[in-house]
Curated annotation (Swiss-Prot):
This is S-adenosylmethionine synthase. Keywords: ATP-binding, Cytoplasm, Magnesium, Metal-binding, Nucleotide-binding, One-carbon metabolism, Potassium, Transferase. K(+) binds at E50. It is found in: Cytoplasm. The gene is metK. ATP binds at H22, D180, G181, K182, R246, F247, D255, R261, K262, A278, K282. One of its GO terms (cellular component) is cytoplasm. The keyword Metal-binding applies.
């Protein structure tokens, strides 16, 4: 996919985001709130928490092995309240919704490989080999020089618009807004560089007595214009605000939500490939989550060190085995070093075994709920360990030594 865009001198690329009040994002936040509550008390707990929301009902289910107890219904209602579903007229609120739970222990067959990896069973004594990957699969990380946070511009702007939509609702700037909402940004690229914004789409849930004309004018003035750089807007930029003309019924009343249904919103907005695994509700032994974070960490530090303008890394695992099956990279013809040398730098500076990832990034902490809306990656307002650029100097030193040796 990326090669198709890269071979065209002019193309459009679109990414979307959703607000914290979107039904799928309600579920992600609940699942990660449960994870945080458990991991705060029991850092080595195994958690796979799924949530579904629908009209008047929340169902929390999954497989959890832990020594602690958390009051899940109380957590659920707290998340719903924090999001802003607090009025009965919304049709779904924190006080009246039903909460059902169905929690089992993690399968002992899975635990056999996670708690004692294949390497450990063979007699290897390195403690970082003890934890096996929690599942098979492939995970991707990506970084580019397009934005200060090393994220693609379309998803970066879409997230900022969604956050702004929630902000003007919560601070009273646009008090008639309700929690559900979406954003979408289409960027026009010329020779791989962002040239202009082709279109901006906003869906904003609202009270019934507000006119479409007022909503459109308010959203453009208070949401779009403060976020989109003026140098990327022109007279041809198209704005679509509540394109159906009405968005009163929203949230779980209008759409059933599930954990893990917004995986491209959570990552790169489709600009990079995705292995298919979701993040929220999963403890860090699940490489769906932790290896994606690590892959982002690697890609971001490599790009920041000047090795490429765009870099995508794939890592693959087998359940119960600590060492990855494969590591590969794609630099989209932007690399300043051959791929073999870049892979050697990755091997030198980054340990991709699950236990090493968990320890090096400090993942056995309650840091996950804050990532469950507005993206897990490229969040400059959060101190996320996989977003740190603390390997850049060491990478540059290795680049220098490789240059000298040649």
């Amino acid at each position: 996919m990326s090669q198709t865009f890269g071979n065209s001198s002019k193309y459009l690329f679109t990414s979307e985001s959703v607000t914290e009040g979107h039904p799928d994002k309600i579920c992600d936040q609940i699942s990660d709130a449960v994870l945080d509550a458990i991991i705060a008390k029991d850092p080595t707990a195994h958690v796979a928490c799924e949530t579904a929301v629908t009209n008047g009902l929340v169902v929390v289910m999954g497989e959890i092995t832990t020594s602690c107890y958390v009051e899940i219904p109380e957590l659920v209602r707290g998340v719903i309240k924090d999001i802003g579903y607090i009025k009965p007229e919304y049709g779904f609120d924190d006080r009246t919704c039903g909460v059902l739970t169905s929690i089992n222990r993690q399968s002992p067959d899975i635990a056999l490989g996670v708690n004692k990896s294949q390497e450990a069973k063979s007699g290897q004594v390195d403690e970082l080999d003890l934890t096996g990957a929690g599942d098979q699969g492939m995970m991707f990380g990506y970084a580019c020089t397009e934005t200060p946070e090393y994220m693609p511009l379309p998803i970066s702007l879409a997230h900022r618009l969604s956050k702004r939509l929630a902000e003007v609702r919560k601070n009273g700037t646009l008090p008639y807004l309700r929690p559900d909402g979406k954003s979408q940004v289409t960027v026009e690229y010329h020779n791989g560089k962002a040239k202009r914004i082709s279109s901006v789409v906003i869906g904003a849930q609202h009270d019934p007595d507000i006119t479409t004309e007022k909503i459109q004018a308010d959203i453009i003035r208070e949401v779009i214009k403060p976020i989109i750089p003026t140098n990327l807007l022109d007279e041809k930029t198209e704005y679509y605000v509540n394109a159906t003309g009405r968005f009163v019924v929203g949230g779980p009343v209008s759409d059933t939500g599930f954990t893990g249904r917004k995986i491209l919103v959570d990552t790169y907005g489709g600009f990079a490939r995705h292995g298919g695994g979701a993040f929220s509700g999963k403890d860090p032994t699940k490489v769906d989550r932790s290896a994606c974070y690590m892959a982002r960490y690697i890609a971001k530090n490599l790009v920041a060190a000047g090795l490429a303008d765009r870099l995508e890394i794939q890592v693959a695992y087998v359940i119960g085995v600590a060492h990855p099956l494969s590591v590969s990279i794609e630099t989209f013809n932007t690399a300043r070093m051959n791929h073999e040398d870049i892979l050697s730098i990755i091997q030198k500076h980054f340990d991709l075994r699950p236990e090493a990832i968990i320890r090096n990034l400090g993942l056995r902490r309650p840091i996950y709920r804050q990532t469950a809306a507005y993206g897990h990656l490229g969040r400059p307002e959060l101190d996320l360990p996989w977003e740190r650029l603390d390997k850049v100097d060491a990478i540059k030193a290795t680049i220098e030594s490789l240059s000298v040796s040649k």
